[in-house]
Amino acid sequence: MSELNTTIRWKPQSTGTGRFGKWLENLNDWNLSRSRFWGTPLPIWRSETGEEKCIESIQQLYDEIELSVKAGNMSSNPLKEKGFVPGDYSDENYHKIDLHRPYVDNIILTSETGKPMKRELDLMDVWFDSGSMPFAQIHYPFENRDQIDKNLSFPADFIAEGVDQTRGWFFTLHAIATMIRDSVAYKAVVSNGLVLDKNGNKMSKHLGNAVDPFGVIEKYGIDPVRWYMMTNSSPWDNLKFDEAG
């Protein structure tokens, strides 16, 4: 990941070599699991004896449920009951099912030795969802493979976000693209600075130093506010907002 990072054009460059680069150099293992209710379920089923199955697609899940019905560990296939057809990627078909909790937790699979298997109750870190965006948005690898495999829509020409995303979106995009494609997820980054109060502190309702942007726009007009934002700092630097000028 560090090697691939050297090919990305960062603006400012110091964020790529400094904040982001140092983060990669001192990277710890990414713990993907989260003990939550809302989110993407981990597709891992385990038996009480430690056997595991990691499900890679809904087609595989459908087939595993069919095997579990035959083994007597499930009375019926809930996907089949709802009229879901594997391989039909239409919205109409996918709206028939919901594989979030609690529904997915009711699916019991069967191990190679015939033991019932229950799903690992934890969820995936929501940042995994965010970092999967280049692939998930086009349903890769199940559809539109050329978009990724032939680099028609990947990697992105550039992305732009706040500097606080070096450990969030910038990192998860980079990590997942490296794992899946040994590639960068984006060719360039515009790392925006943050809007702070006039003393350089983070705006907070608790501190009472937050500025209502709609009130400022209503008072001065949108173009003067834009001009103020553009001329008082570079896009990648933090801006100390002071209504006095």
List the predicted regions and their residue ranges:
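Structured secondary-structure scaffolds
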Residues: 1-245
